[in-house]
Amino acid sequence: MEHVNEILATVGVILQQTQTTQDVNASAKLGAYIGAGVTMIAGSTVGIGQGYIFGKAVEAIARNPEVEKQVFKLIFIGSAVSESTAIYGLLISFILIFVAGA
């Protein structure tokens, strides 16, 4: 009977350690998914900023049509630079979901 109790105690300890490991893995996945969601804020803020910038560019061209080429050149360069922030955020969220969350 003592051997049965020892075996049951050993199995209980193993199951408890397995459960703790599963909890840690679940917490790591949860943290990765929350981090991925937070990084996507970068994409939304870039969209808001680009909308504001393009609106102001249209206003500038409406006031002074002669500067259309200059404004569009600056707008496209600025748009590409600001879009890189959203792309980096998307890349980080993919890494968090598919690498850290796996």
From Swiss-Prot:
CDD domains xrefs: ATP-synt_Fo_c_NaATPase
GO biological process, one term: proton motive force-driven ATP synthesis
Pfam families: ATP-synt_C
Cellular localisation: Cell membrane
This protein's record includes keyword Nucleotide-binding: no
Any one GO MF annotation of this record: lipid binding
Residues the UniProt record annotates as site (Reversibly protonated during proton transport): E83
Residue ranges crossing the lipid bilayer per the database entry: 34-54, 80-100
Record PROSITE patterns: ATPASE_C
The keyword Membrane appears for this protein: yes
Membrane topology designation: Multi-pass membrane protein
Top-level lineage group: Bacteria
Keyword terms: ATP synthesis, Cell membrane, CF(0), Hydrogen ion transport, Ion transport, Lipid-binding, Membrane, Transmembrane, Transmembrane helix, Transport
A cellular component term, taken from the record's GO annotations: plasma membrane
Family affiliation: Belongs to the ATPase C chain family.
Additional facts recorded: Dicyclohexylcarbodiimide (DCDD) binding to the active glutamate residue inhibits ATPase in vitro.
The name this protein goes by in its record: ATP synthase subunit c
Native source organism of the sequence: Mycoplasma genitalium (strain ATCC 33530 / DSM 19775 / NCTC 10195 / G37) (Mycoplasmoides genitalium)
